Amino acid sequence: QERYGFKYLCADERNELAKVGADFIQSYQSKVPFLLVLSFINPHDICFVMPSKTRPPFEKAYKREPEIKMAVDSLSRIADSMPVGFFETDASAPLPKNLQPTVNNIYDNGRLISDKTDSEWRRYIWMYHRMVEIVDAQIGKVLDALDKSPLKDNTIVIMTSDHGEMRGSHQMIGKNIQYEEAQRVPLIFAGRGIKKGMDDKSVICNVWDLLPTMCEMASIANVPNYEGISLYGLVTEGKPLLKRDYIYLESLQSYQIIKQGRYKYTVREASGLPCMFTDLKVDSLETMNLIEKPQYQDVITELKVILDEELEHRQIVLDENGWRNSKGRVK
């Protein structure tokens, strides 16, 4: 608690965490409001399922966290026990419609996994679905505890994630990739005061917005000069967000993105092409790079200006070593 400023309840993100969270809720007697954060690791273990020529061996990760190997091996044994031919059809796990790489792609850079068969991809996706089921059950244990608790009517639950999973789209897996599969995450609010039945996939927001939203929900001051905006009015009354018409994104893989409605403009430091442009209304699966299409040049110019302004604001420049700011290489 002295190190972090809060009490650290559990180091086991796979098995014990759900019980610890449920026990905390069931035993909580104080009148003081609380913030309970349960960071379930899965389905992140899927990152250690599919070896490839383009991916480093998993031995270091296994040595660092033996629990990873135990979890992966357990599911692998179940996958191996399935009937012969089980992964030969989409009945086991449908392949993504955009399994093939993007035409005129700027993001190969060793990330494509082109040495796998359709059956191997289905096995991978099937295991991913099982990991989602596992964490779904764990979250369910916590929600069941809350449902039986006096805290139920005075608690707000937020479910989200720090990144998505490519899951075979564009022959890629993992995160740190500019595609929608890796960028989009669930953001679910439930509980006291939350507007019921609302499902809005068009909202331009990200995890920056969690802090100001929770601060407003708790009637406490937000951090000064913080970039995020509160979603409180949206999730409680359905009020539209008026302060943002685009979002800026960056990644470990050194790309910079401006996403504005249906359009996405991406720049990467190390590629054969300078940038990528996608019209998500026309090509929701991002199968084509439209950067050279004449009909989009005005939009591309506008997004480039916005990106340049963002980079200037953040003091980020591109030199021979990649994207850098005043603190060094952008990560």
Language model feature labels by segment:
Residues 36, 156-158, 266, 278:
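Hydrophobic/aromatic beta-strand patches that form the interior of the parallel beta-sheet core
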Residues 1-32, 44:
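Active-site-proximal alpha/beta segments of enzymes that process anionic O-linked groups
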Residues 17-21, 163-169, 195-196, 208-280, ...:
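C-terminal cap/loop subdomain of S1 sulfatases and analogous C-terminal strand-loop tails that border
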Residues 51, 98-123, 131, 135, ...:
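Long, internal low-complexity/basic segments
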Residues 33-35, 182, 262, 275:
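Structural motif
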Residues 7-8, 173-175, 292-295:
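Short glycine-enriched, charge-decorated loop/helix-capping segments at active-site entrances
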Residues 27-32, 40-154, 158-204, 217-220, ...:
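Active-site-proximal cap/lid insertion segments
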Residues 22-26, 129-132, 136-143, 147, ...:
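Non-transmembrane alpha-helical segments in soluble domains
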